[in-house]
Each structure stands twice: as structure tokens, then as C-alpha cells.
Amino acid sequence: MTNQKRKRTSTAAPKKGGDELTYSSYLALDELLRLQRPRSKPEHPDELLFIIVHQASELWFKLILHELEGLIALLEARDTLGALTSVRRVNALVHIVTGQLSALETLPPQRFAQFRGYLGTSSGSQSVQFRAIEAMSGMRDEHFLQVLKQHGEIAPLVQRALAKPTLQQLFDDLLEAHDVTLEQIYAELHQRPLQMLAEGLLEYEQGFAMWRFLHVQLVERIIGPGTSGTGGTLGSKYLQTTISQRFFPKLWEVRSKFFNG
């Protein structure tokens, strides 16, 4: 009986500083819930919604970056099934971020106009984590690099993302390691895991494109198509140019080969 009691005690989580870990302390809720600081005077009742949706998006961006790091490591290790599981999680996270936009659709333009001036020059285009996600996913063209430099030096987080191989490059390397082509993974049944991974990557791009599209619609719904962004951007006109950007052009192009000989 004594031995059993000792065994149960030894498996208990150690206490730090004699304080019991609680839900609140583990999640640092006291600090987290103090981070919403509306700037409007008097405080506009809708500004808290605006802040929380954007803060929550940044938390999800942090997790997406973390998962993309893991996906890259799995692709580098040639772990097809592990990468497939990883990309499914990334896709679920992108879906969550996209769903959050519906909350901002409840913000009428006249009410946003009442506190928009308090945002100053802050803009979603300044999101370092979002830019890092784009870079890690495959955005490397000159236009993208010029956009990054609009706000000064490229942030270290984005620089690290740019230093990594893109997801497309890593998938190409995976195909080369298996000595197969893109056409073969779609034509040969035994290449099903690679095909599923390719479709998972394509779903990731589609999810990202859907977020972009709905973001454009949201911006135009709230501030209209002719209003400039708070950060000096062209507003929805700039966002429109991002919709057609693709991470995996080869995964789109291979489909044509089954119909055009």
C-alpha cells in the first residue's frame, strides 16, 4: 500500500514555487486579457471587437508558422505520411482564421468610421507574421520583396522564412527522392500518398486564397472600394492584386496535361 502511494505521488506534476498551477496561470489569462487597449475616446463599443479579431488572428498566425516549420522539417526528412498529417492541421488553422472574418462583417461602415481615425498609420499590411507565412509558403518574387521593404528593413522573422526552401521546392525534392514525376503520382495508384500530399498542399493554397478573397470583400464592405488603407496602401485595390498569387503553380499546371494531351 505504501509503495502504491509513493508511486502515485512520484507521477504528480511538480509545483513551481509552491503555487498550484491553475487554468488561469497556465494560460497567463491575467496578462492576456489586459492586452486589449482601445484607443478611442470615449471608448467606442465596437473597437474591442476589432482588436480581439486581429489579436486572435495573430495568435493563429503564430501557430500556423509553428506548424509550417514542422511541415518543412517533415518534408526535408522525406516523411510523406507525417507531412500529410501536418498539412491537414495547417489547413484546419487557415480555415479557423478565415472564419473569424465573419465577425468583422457585423461592423457597419458608419460605426467603423467613428473610431478608424484612432488607428493612426497601423495596418494589417504591417503584420510580420503574415508576411513570414507568405514567404515560407512560396512568395519570393520581386514585387513581394518590394512590398516587404515599404515599411523599412525586412523583419528578422521574414528574413528567416526567406532563407528556407519553399514548400514547392521541398515537394519537388520529395518527388525526386521517390524518382517520380507529378504526372505519375496522379496516374499511378501506388503513388496515392504523394498524390494526397499534393492535394493537401493545394488545399492549403486554396484556403489561403479564400482568406484573401473574403478579406477583400470585407474591406470593401466596410470602407468601400475607393478608400485608402490606414497604412498608406491602396486599400482593397492593393488586396485585389494578391488574390491571383500562387504558391504551387506546378500543382495547378499538371492538371492541364490530362486534358491537353
List the model feature ranges, each with a label.
Residues 2-261:
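Surface-exposed peri-terminal alpha-helical interaction modules
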